[in-house]
């Protein structure tokens, strides 16, 4: 089908990182040696400076959240910001959050996700299609939301993600920490996600988290939970068209990053030794070392 064809046209990226400029990109390059870098949205002049410092580096792009709570939806400002960074990095995909960190002028420290029902599915599909049409040179991917409570709305996450991908022909960024937290909250096993659209997964994110009441909250400064790494080994064989696995490490300390990134790479290499960078990908390097 068209979506799978689009995913398969993307070169395999390998094992990379998703970050901004902290920790220092030079240290990341010299010490961690990721296969690719997914940059979180930064001011264009900062993105340009990073791109200039690392010529030949394969970059991907993690944009902001699509404001499904805001009547304006996908604004021209949102599109223009994405286009500017895409023109600098030349990524193959552009990820957006299926959630919101603001309602009006109120900001939250965690994403507020949509109800899993047909109304929000229709709204999210309209906004994803609108954004994909505005950036046709990349494949837009959307991320499974972080649960702050049991997902309301009547649909399962598996059905919601599959129907949204089918309706938009956009790929999926599978955030394993979000999935692991949902499984803990629902006392679920992988059998409960048999209908998940694994074949549409373009990239997997793994990240640190911290316990809060009965759930895990995203905390990229914390170590990765051992259960998340075990889940990575379990889901990788299911993601038959995956192009990359990235460790989300924005603002993590160097000792934690030095410990965690090799663990992620070891899991990937042991379970999916075929996930090696292909032609069209270039190993991260810094000139004049």
Regions found by a protein language model. Give the residues of each.
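Distinct, well-ordered alpha-helical segments
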Residues: 28, 51, 150-166, 182-195, ...
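Boundary/entry segment of secreted carbohydrate-active catalytic domains
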Residues: 1-35, 40-41
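Acidic (Asp/Glu)-rich catalytic clusters
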Residues: 7-10, 27-32, 45-61, 77-92, ...
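Active-site-proximal loop/turn and secondary-structure-junction residues that shape catalytic pockets
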Residues: 21-23, 41-45, 65-67, 98-102, ...
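Conserved, mostly hydrophobic/aromatic
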Residues: 37, 94, 140, 175, ...
